[in-house]
């Protein structure tokens, strides 16, 4: 699924922050996984990487519903 342009719940424009968050998420996962790209990490249900503080660190003013859309959406074009 692609990241929505606006939040389905509150209407906040998520699309304007999607590229910033995606770049920061890639760098954050690289540092947590010792330089491995997110595309090369094997699927493992026990692997947990907390991303909730990343939005706060970037200074993006979002509600919980918007955070959920950004964190849980995976752009399949990068993996297939």
UniProtKB/Swiss-Prot annotation:
The keyword Zinc applies. Disulfide bonds: none annotated. Keywords: DNA-directed RNA polymerase, Host cytoplasm, Metal-binding, Transcription, Viral transcription, Zinc. One of its GO terms (cellular component) is host cell cytoplasm. Zn(2+) binds at residues 7, 10, 65-66. It is found in: Host cytoplasm. It comes from the Viruses. GO terms for molecular function: DNA binding; DNA-directed RNA polymerase activity; zinc ion binding. Its main location: host cell. The keyword Endoplasmic reticulum does not apply. Gene3D superfamilies: Homeodomain-like. GO terms for biological process: DNA-templated transcription; viral transcription. It holds the Pfam family RNA_pol_N. Signal peptide: none annotated. Component of the DNA-directed RNA polymerase (RNAP) that catalyzes the transcription in the cytoplasm of viral DNA into RNA using the four ribonucleoside triphosphates as substrates. Part of the viral DNA-directed RNA polymerase that consists of 8 polII-like subunits (RPB1, RPB2, RPB3, RPB5, RPB6, RPB7, RPB9, RPB10), a capping enzyme and a termination factor. Belongs to the archaeal RpoN/eukaryotic RPB10 RNA polymerase subunit family. This is DNA-directed RNA polymerase RPB10 homolog. It comes from African swine fever virus (strain Badajoz 1971 Vero-adapted) (Ba71V). The lineage of its organism: Viruses, Varidnaviria, Bamfordvirae, Nucleocytoviricota, Pokkesviricetes.
């Amino acid at each position: 699924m692609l990241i929505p342009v606006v939040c389905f719940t509150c209407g906040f424009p998520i699309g304007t922050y999607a590229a910033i968050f995606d770049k920061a998420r890639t760098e954050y996962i690289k540092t947590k996984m010792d330089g491995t790209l997110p595309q090369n990490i094997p699927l493992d249900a026990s692997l947990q990487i907390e991303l909730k503080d990343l939005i706060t660190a970037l200074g993006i003013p979002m509600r919980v519903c918007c955070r959920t859309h950004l964190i849980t959406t995976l752009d399949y074009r990068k993996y297939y």
